[in-house]
């Protein structure tokens, strides 16, 4: 079973959101990176870009496919992980840590997102 930390919330598209001191850090889940396989390219929005919950904010390309990354929250991107763009395999190696993707201004509604237990059940249902 893929790792599912309790300190963040999750989408049905397999993204995570973690509040961090006035911002929401976003990434893809361990399950997502496992399904994608070896990630070879990451495209992220520049700081200042407005993102909308449920809409694509970037993409990841693996040796298997190209997949959109959907924003779990609405707001303005305040930071992107340049390391994930220049070293995409970090998303495979550490999806919940060094492989984060963007940070968005806090304040977006997260009520539609699942907690870890609900996400675990969702993944197990397949």
Locate the predicted segments by residue.
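Acidic, low-complexity mobile loops and tails
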Residues: 1-56, 89, 93-126
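Short aromatic-glycine motifs in intrinsically disordered, low-complexity regions
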Residues: 63-67
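Histidine- and aromatic-rich ligand-binding microenvironments
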Residues: 68-72
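Short, loop-centered acidic/histidine patches that primarily coordinate divalent metals
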Residues: 74, 80, 107
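Short, conserved catalytic or interaction motifs in soluble domains
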Residues: 62, 82
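Conserved hydrophobic positions within beta-strands
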Residues: 14, 60, 74-77
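Short amphipathic beta-strand starts and helix->beta connectors
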Residues: 83-88
């Amino acid at each position: 079973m893929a790792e599912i930390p309790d300190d963040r919330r999750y989408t049905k598209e397999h993204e995570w959101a973690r509040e961090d001191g006035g911002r929401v850090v976003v990434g893809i889940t361990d399950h997502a990176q496992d399904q994608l396989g070896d990630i070879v390219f990451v495209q992220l929005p520049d700081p200042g870009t407005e993102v909308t919950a449920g809409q694509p904010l970037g993409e990841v390309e693996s040796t298997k496919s190209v997949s959109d990354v959907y924003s779990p929250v609405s707001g303005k991107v305040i930071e992107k992980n340049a390391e994930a763009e220049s070293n995409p395999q970090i998303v495979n190696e550490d999806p919940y840590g060094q492989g984060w993707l963007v940070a968005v201004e806090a304040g977006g509604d997260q009520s539609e997102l699942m907690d870890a237990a609900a996400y675990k059940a969702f993944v197990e249902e397949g």
